[in-house]
């Protein structure tokens, strides 16, 4: 199911049309999953948009990258303001999902990521109603086992960990 992306995104500190936010094919995160994300809900009450637990989300956002020495080069306040700002820029008047993420950028094919690796940050939003179909869902139990918490910090919201959830 493809959801409509917001017209504007926040990318590396600037608001821009979504189609202008581009990354090179040598972006490290594409090859190795070195991305950090949050999923934030915001609820429209008919008058105002309320972002759910923004401060807690921003703190976890930064902490997830610290597990892997991936730097978030914006302050928590700048990220929180960008989350609110992208909702305003897109004139959001209904409940929505906000996806901030940062990732190791044009770092090439290298397995050794350091805190000096270039990072990019983006935030976008889209309308998000019910997560599941009101008529029910189909579910299954798979035979795959999750990674052990001893093998990788599974509590970090990282792109490389997401398939394990």
Map each language-model feature to its residues.
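Helix-start/capping segments and mature chain N-termini
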Residues: 1-73, 81-85, 109-165
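Short secondary-structure capping/junction motifs at helix and strand boundaries
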Residues: 71-76, 88-99, 132-134
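Short loop/turn motifs enriched for small/polar and acidic residues
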Residues: 101-105
